């Protein structure tokens, strides 16, 4: 029954136009590039199938991972290696990932205040990070109601770069840095290669270059704005005296038993960027010094057809249009 005429009836697109598009896609072959960014996949009954069908066209033309085709964005993004990472969680908070939505890929935070209101549980301590649900979500009034009830949110700390509606309902408002006030790694799927860039807090780096280094970023930032990484390091060491299994994930990889610093964190990461140690050494620099100086590093100029060697991260190692795992 799946004819061009049937598709016209379902979609409103003329049958002859559908046939013409199909021929053009076939002619493009491996140079067919397309993907579904929300669009019909969001808020439509059966919309989840749109991305599957569109990707199947890429499969049929052999364009998956090909030059001029469509690649997984993870092929073009650098994934950093962190010191002392915790083991994956063995269970989840059903206030964030409710049983009603077993295939949810992201935390369904828009439902949280409604679950609290139903009496499903309590958030003893809640950090809202660069997040303004009172304004952003459709039912901001329920968030306001729950934030005002200490039996639902015991303590609410808002980590935010701005004063906003959600911060108004917080017990603590903790100013977080904007782009020029913090360290970050950047790596985006901008083209067929893979790269990593290093964002640095401007005033801290300026102070270091002028011979006036600081220990913590907030000492250089206006308004004592904290570096998030340092905030979590400090908070974790204050929460855990070493008996709770938290502090061990915030230890220096170079000074056993000591608290990790922001410089050590990024030095550890950059030491493990493929090709960077050799390039930095050629300039007489450490990996961190190289990234401070240059700001970016090209890891791979092109990343095509990796699946031919690595397969896919599915039970079968193949792309699964029909998946026994989901069924």
Regions found by a protein language model. Give the residues of each.
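Long, low-complexity segments enriched in small/aliphatic residues
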Residues: 255-327
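Conserved hydrophobic/aromatic pocket- or pore-lining residues that grip, position, or stack substrates
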Residues: 57
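Short connector loops at secondary-structure junctions
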Residues: 64-93
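Disordered, low-complexity tails and leader-like regions
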Residues: 83-88, 185, 302-304
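Non-catalytic alpha/beta scaffold blocks inside enzyme catalytic domains
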Residues: 1-33, 37-53, 61-66, 74, ...
């Amino acid at each position: 029954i799946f004819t061009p005429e049937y598709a016209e009836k379902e979609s409103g697109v003329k049958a002859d136009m559908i046939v013409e598009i199909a021929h053009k896609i076939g002619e493009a072959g491996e140079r067919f590039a397309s993907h579904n960014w929300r669009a019909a996949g969001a808020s439509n009954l059966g919309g989840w199938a749109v991305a599957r069908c569109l990707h199947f066209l890429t499969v049929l033309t052999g364009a998956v991972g090909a030059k001029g085709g469509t690649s997984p964005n993870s092929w073009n993004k650098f994934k950093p290696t962190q010191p002392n990472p915790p083991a994956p969680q063995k269970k989840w908070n059903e206030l964030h990932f409710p049983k009603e939505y077993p295939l949810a890929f992201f935390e369904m935070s828009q439902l949280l205040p409604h679950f609290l209101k139903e009496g499903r549980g309590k958030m003893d301590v809640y950090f809202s990070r660069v997040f303004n649900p009172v304004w952003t979500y459709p039912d901001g009034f329920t968030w306001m109601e729950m934030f005002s009830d200490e039996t639902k949110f015991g303590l609410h700390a808002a980590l935010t770069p701005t004063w906003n509606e959600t911060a108004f309902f917080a017990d603590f408002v903790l100013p977080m840095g904007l782009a020029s006030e913090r360290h970050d790694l950047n790596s985006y799927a901008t083209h067929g290669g893979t790269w990593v860039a290093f964002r640095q807090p401007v005033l801290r780096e300026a102070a270091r270059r002028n011979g006036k280094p600081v220990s913590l970023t907030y000492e250089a930032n206006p308004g004592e704005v904290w570096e998030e990484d340092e905030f979590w390091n400090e908070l974790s060491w204050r929460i855990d005296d070493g008996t709770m299994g938290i502090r061990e994930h915030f230890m220096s990889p170079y000074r056993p038993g000591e608290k990790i610093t922001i410089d050590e964190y990024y030095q550890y990461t950059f030491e493990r960027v493929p090709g960077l140690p050799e390039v930095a050494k050629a300039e007489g620099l450490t990996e961190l010094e190289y990234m401070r100086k240059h700001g970016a590093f090209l890891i791979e100029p092109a990343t095509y057809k990796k699946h031919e060697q690595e397969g896919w991260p599915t039970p079968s190692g193949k792309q699964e249009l029909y998946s026994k795992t989901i069924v």
